[in-house]
Amino acid sequence: MSRPILVFDSGIGGLSVLAEIRKSLPHSDYCYLFDNARLPYGELEEQVLIAGCVALVCDLVARTNAMIVVVACNTASTVVLPALRANLSIPVVGVVPAIKPAAQMSKSKRIGLLATPGTVKRHYTHELISQFADDCHVELFGCSELVMMAEQKIATGEMDMHRLADLLAPVVAAQLDVLVLGCTHFPMIQAELQQVLGAGVTLMDSGAAIAKRVVTLLTQQNLIVEQRRVTNEREALGQSVMQAFYTKAEISEGLTTTLIDCGFSTIERITTTN
């Protein structure tokens, strides 16, 4: 196994980001770490979140010799990123809600941000809106329940569309033409969201932008050279190595099946004391 790209989230949402990165670097090795024992992150105190994430990620970086960390979680990106960068010597990439491209795309200049309550209320989010969407009317919608609905869909294949419609009623009423998916879990239920909101609302997430940033940083660190070598070897030998790590006591059969379908050959529980 070559030095992997480590993608980190509280749950399965980061798989949407991982999929975008793999489009750009299909032959790289990947580790996916999801801290599902402490899901959802938006309900944790900040210092508890920081301490747990730093310990968990730094331990796995040391174990796997990862060359870059992608924090594929909006809540962790706004809270934990500085501490991770202070404790790691490798690049750390975070998630930024796609406020800027949403404002540029909107014709009506009525856009929305659908995220967890923590992301919605943070000063960083409001700075993004002031900087990049000052010519737009921006509606903010905070909902943790959607995170658990996405997790439930992956675990069971089921989605309560009536409940989803109830949760999205304020979004429908706002008459937006662009909605930013400000949580990496939400692209996992994008089809269902689109069904409720209708074709008149464009959904935007940050996955492609994160993938582009990863490629840029690997190039700047001269690690893209290693990736080109790995790519040549993998084209000759076959599939890249995919490892998944989780923190909960156990995971559902449905989630295990999803991870296998995504290409993970190793699915392992790791323990955390935080």
UniProtKB/Swiss-Prot annotation:
Keyword Cell wall biogenesis/degradation in the entry? The reply is yes
Its Enzyme Commission number(s) read 5.1.1.3
Q: Which UniProt keywords apply?
A: Cell shape, Cell wall biogenesis/degradation, Isomerase, Peptidoglycan synthesis
The residues the record assigns to binding substrate are 9-10, 41-42, 74-75, 184-185
| UniProt keyword annotation of RNA-binding present | no
Reactions catalysed, as given in the entry: L-glutamate = D-glutamate
Q: Which Pfam families match?
A: Asp_Glu_race (PF01177)
Which positions are catalytic residues?
73, 183
Annotated GO biological processes are:
cell wall organization; peptidoglycan biosynthetic process; regulation of cell shape
Task: Name any one GO molecular function.
Answer: glutamate racemase activity
Q: Which InterPro entries match?
A: Asp/Glu/hydantoin_racemase, Asp/Glu_race, Asp/Glu_racemase_AS_1, Asp/Glu_racemase_AS_2, Glu_race
Q: Which residues form a coiled coil?
A: none
Q: In which pathway does it act?
A: Cell wall biogenesis; peptidoglycan biosynthesis
Broad EC category: isomerase
Q: Give the similarity note.
A: Belongs to the aspartate/glutamate racemases family.
Q: What does this protein do?
A: Provides the (R)-glutamate required for cell wall biosynthesis.
What PANTHER family does the annotation carry?
A: GLUTAMATE RACEMASE
Name of this protein: Glutamate racemase
Gene symbol here is murI
